[in-house]
A protein has these predicted regions:
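Active-site helix of classical SDR
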Residues: 10, 18
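Alpha-helical segment proximal to the catalytic Tyr-Lys
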Residues: 23-27, 85
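Short, flexible catalytic-loop segment of classical short-chain dehydrogenase/reductase
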Residues: 36-47
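A conserved structural motif in NAD(P)-dependent oxidoreductases
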Residues: 61-72
Length: 103
């Protein structure tokens, strides 16, 4: 949203920080990831629930439901358990397929 420029800039900056630290820490055996949640049911999204209920029903995401905080937690748990030992600097989208919907 153009009304949330500060939020958008901060998120974009995290992408660069992820790549920077992935490169710097790889020699130490430390992998770095960026976890990008999509539409997640939370206090932050509560004010726009009706809007996103409609968008999700209309196919905003291939997985037609709100994301839950536990969806993000499960992704982070997999990373913390070293489930991807030969991967670093990557974006992990937890977004119900939102990023592929325009194929």
């Amino acid at each position: 949203s153009t009304n949330r420029g500060d939020y958008c800039v901060a998120k974009a900056g995290l992408g660069m920080v992820t790549k920077l630290f992935a490169a710097r820490l790889a020699d130490l055996g430390i992998n770095v990831y960026e976890v990008c949640p999509g539409v997640i049911a939370s206090d932050m999204t509560a004010p726009v629930q009706a809007k996103y209920d409609k968008l999700i029903d209309e196919g905003l995401t291939p997985i037609r439901r709100w994301g839950e905080p536990s969806d993000v937690g499960k992704a982070v748990l997999a990373l913390a358990q070293d489930a991807f030992p030969f991967t670093t600097g990557e974006v992990i989208n937890v977004d119900g397929g939102f990023t592929i919907r325009r194929i």
